[in-house]
Amino acid sequence: MEARVCVLFGAAALLRLLLLCVGVYQDQTLKLKYTDVDYHVFTDAARFITQGESPYRRSTFRYTPLLALLLVPNVYLSLLFGKLLFGFCDLLSGLLMFRLLVLRGASHGSACVSCGLWLLNPLPMAVSTRGNAESVLAVLVLSTLLCLQLRKHTTAALLFGLSVHMKIYPVTYALPIALALTAAPARGRGVLLRFFSPALLRFAAVSAAVFLSLGLIFYCRYGWEFLQEAYLYHLTRRDLRHNFSPFFYLQYVCAERCWSSGLLPLLLLPQLLLLLLASAAFSSDLPFCCFLHTAVFVSFNRVCTSQYFLWYLCLLPVVLPRLRLRLGRGLLLLLLWLLLQGLWLAPAYLLEFQGWNSFSWIWAASLLFLLTNTFILAQIIQHYRPHDRKAD
């Protein structure tokens, strides 16, 4: 590995270790804690598992028990174990990005620059060192794409099934993956026959077997509570508190109406339509299509928080070298994205900490943020160079 790659990863590791030390100091001395409250939820759930009880005895633990099992060393070794694990997954994500970029024809220099936007990005650094598990899913998603790029379809299917078990949103990649797997060998066949290709059937069988097996194991152990907290809660969740999605206000004002439950299918329609269009248009370039899928899913979701941004930011470095955006335009789009977040945070702060009734201002800022995200995605699509198979 080149010296500059080693320097990049070494600097990224040191920065994360530094943030861990800062977090320990802040937690011990300041009123405002560094550690994410979810990290304490994960640890408590792991402690219940070590006692032979259900992790769902910990209120607000709404994840797979597999996550609690990963953090059992928090109980026996050190509370820092999980943060070290998540930080390591951050670095591993960067390595997977580098491999993907090189496979897609990027030079080592270009790959280093793109990976640096993840490895030296303060957002993923802060999220992982505060104890949020998003980096684990980033590793699974990037590993799936890398194995598909290497045409290791069985391994990719195993990882994809595990990804969907960990969190629901990667299931949106199913259609792009299906189209990508059937594109080359199924030319000349009917549209429906393409979906019966051996490669796709094998991928579907393996990924479904992984997902269903893990689900069955945990259902037998923890019963309906597992299905409710790990999956059904997220499918039916209505966040009436303020978040980046403009749909939160609609759910807030209609919460007490008898017909409010009928809003859910309507809120899903924009997402579904855009995901179908993205699949049809860009499935030949799977990493780019998955990036668009995730960005659309997050932007148009009925609940959107800042940690969701990592779901597509971990894919952005992989597609970045094929963007033909001028540096000035790219920086302007980044500034616009950050500015609109600040515009949203101002009334959210007034509501949360000052008690002001600023719901309408938050809603207006959420609408502007959605429009901004849509504009940025349109710019990315417009300036993206189509996938060149020879580069692989």
Swiss-Prot record:
Q: Which UniProt keywords apply?
A: Endoplasmic reticulum, Glycosyltransferase, GPI-anchor biosynthesis, Membrane, Transferase, Transmembrane, Transmembrane helix
The family database entries (InterPro entries) matched by this protein are listed as: PIG-M (IPR007704)
- UniProt record, GO biological process: GPI anchor biosynthetic process
Q: Name one matching Pfam family.
A: Mannosyl_trans
**Any single Gene Ontology cellular-component annotation:** glycosylphosphatidylinositol-mannosyltransferase I complex
Please give the superkingdom of this protein's source: Eukaryota
**Is Ion transport among the key words of this record?**
no
The UniProt transmembrane annotation reads 5-25, 66-86, 126-148, 157-177, 199-219, 262-282, 303-323, 331-351, 361-381
Question: Which family does the entry's similarity section mention?
Answer: Belongs to the PIGM family.
What's the stated role of this polypeptide? Catalytic subunit of the glycosylphosphatidylinositol-mannosyltransferase I complex which catalyzes the transfer of the first mannose, via an alpha-1,4 bond from a dolichol-phosphate-mannose (Dol-P-Man) to the glucosaminyl acyl phosphatidylinositol (GlcN-(acyl)PI) intermediate to generate alpha-D-Man-(1->4)-alpha-D-GlcN-(1->6)-(1-radyl,2-acyl-sn-glycero-3-phospho)-2-acyl-inositol and participates in the sixth step of the glycosylphosphatidylinositol-anchor biosynthesis.
The record's note on quaternary structure and interaction partners says: Part of the glycosylphosphatidylinositol-mannosyltransferase I complex that is composed of PIGM and PIGX.
Q: What is this protein called?
A: GPI alpha-1,4-mannosyltransferase I, catalytic subunit
Q: What is the lineage of its organism?
A: Eukaryota, Metazoa, Chordata, Craniata, Vertebrata
